[in-house]
Curated annotation (Swiss-Prot):
Keywords per UniProt: Amino-acid biosynthesis, Cytoplasm, Histidine biosynthesis, Lyase
Record field: catalytic activity: D-erythro-1-(imidazol-4-yl)glycerol 3-phosphate = 3-(imidazol-4-yl)-2-oxopropyl phosphate + H2O
UniProt protein name: Imidazoleglycerol-phosphate dehydratase
EC number, UniProt record: 4.2.1.19
Organism: Caldanaerobacter subterraneus subsp. tengcongensis (strain DSM 15242 / JCM 11007 / NBRC 100824 / MB4) (Thermoanaerobacter tengcongensis)
Molecular-function GO term, any one: imidazoleglycerol-phosphate dehydratase activity
Gene name of this polypeptide: hisB
Subcellular location: Cytoplasm
Transmembrane region(s): none
Pathway(s) where this gene product acts: Amino-acid biosynthesis; L-histidine biosynthesis; L-histidine from 5-phospho-alpha-D-ribose 1-diphosphate: step 6/9
NCBIfam families for this protein: PRK00951.1-2, PRK00951.2-1, PRK00951.2-2, PRK00951.2-4
GO cellular component, one term: cytoplasm
Family statement: Belongs to the imidazoleglycerol-phosphate dehydratase family.
Length: 194
């Protein structure tokens, strides 16, 4: 099974992540940021990953460091757990609607980190969660996993719905791209490496 455990401690945050890519969607998320916990839970549930995230951060300052650093550690965990990437499907695009919102996530587990982000969010906060940190999370995740990630709003206005659809879509897209396909012999690249 493809699993990883990653710890990271800085002067701003202390984060622990356990990941099983081949899980059933169980989760235990505790970041101190209620809305972010909800998003990571949805990500795990819909991606069918078993995920544990325990994070302590300088929330008295703001949520930025915690959200970004969870992205760093989670991306690192996916990189470790995905191993040599032999026989993975590699690419995926997934659309997720939530009421009026429709979000598309496309990704390539390529070893080439990149983020294209186009989620215009009207509200500055959802609960104590600062919405500008959504982009920081996706960037940290993509760059530490080493994937090309596109996250786009096709339509929608409700900030909660847009963010929720994006986390669900990321989970679904990763589930598909990380699936093993017996027809793929070795690394899914003509270069021979990812």
């Amino acid at each position: 099974m493809r699993k990883a455990e990653v710890k990271r401690k800085t002067a701003e945050t202390d984060i622990y992540v356990e990941l099983n890519i081949d899980g059933k969607g169980s989760y235990d998320i505790k970041t101190g940021i209620g809305f972010f916990d909800h998003m990571l839970s949805l990500f795990a549930k819909h991606g069918l990953f078993d995920l544990k995230v325990i994070a302590k951060g300088d929330l008295e300052v703001d949520t930025h460091h915690t959200v970004e650093d969870v992205g760093i550690v989670l991306g690192t965990a996916f990189l470790k757990a995905s191993g040599d990437k032999k026989s993975i499907k590699r690419f995926s695009t997934f659309y997720v609607p939530m009421d009026e919102a429709l979000v598309r996530v496309s990704l390539d587990i390529s070893g080439r980190p990149y983020l294209y982000y186009d989620l215009p969010l009207k509200a500055e906060r959802v609960g104590n969660f600062e919405t500008e940190t959504v982009e920081e999370f996706f960037r940290a995740f993509a760059y530490n996993f080493g994937i090309t990630l596109h996250v786009e709003l096709l339509h929608g206005v409700n900030t909660h719905h847009i963010i929720e659809a994006s986390f669900k879509a990321l989970g679904k897209a990763l589930d598909e791209a990380l699936k093993l396909d017996e027809r793929i012999d070795g690394i899914p690249s003509t270069k021979g490496i990812l």
